[in-house]
Design a protein with these regions (language model features):
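Positively charged, small/polar-rich N-terminal and surface patches that mediate targeting and assembly
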Residues: 1-128
Length: 128
């Protein structure tokens, strides 16, 4: 089993979750988070859910408040090893714009999964 952690733009979460559900992966956890890559933050007029990266890069300081960390969403999904390429591919297809801020995907080993309600373990407990 693997845990796939994807940090994506907030405006692409619905498209991403809909696409994952459509290929058989409706079970996931989402968290609001803030982060940055090498760009070291951006300027924005206020604290929106979605930052227009092209406008930020063009206008810079003229936009107002400096955002050291950009609003993002973390999607976490545990899948069987064989499903990793499919899930990663779906996430990449929806979230790759080719611009700074597209996000990151981490694939981590998961030793065990236990469904609390039933006590089921392993792949059965994943629920996909």
């Amino acid at each position: 089993m693997k845990e796939i952690m994807a940090i994506v733009r907030p405006n692409l979460v619905k498209k991403t979750t809909d696409a994952l559900s459509s290929v058989g992966f409706p079970a996931m956890t989402m968290t609001e988070c803030f982060g940055r890559g090498k760009q070291k933050g951006y300027f924005a007029a206020n604290m929106p859910d979605v930052v227009d990266m092209e406008k930020v890069i063009k206008e810079g300081k003229e936009m107002g408040l400096y955002l050291k960390y950009i609003p993002k969403r973390l999607i976490s999904i545990v899948v069987e090893d064989a499903d990793v390429p499919l899930v990663v591919g779906v996430i990449m297809k929806i979230n790759r714009t080719g611009k700074h801020g597209d996000g990151k995907i981490f694939v981590l080993p998961t030793e065990e999964t236990i469904r609390i309600r039933t006590g089921e373990t392993g792949d059965i407990a994943i629920g996909n």
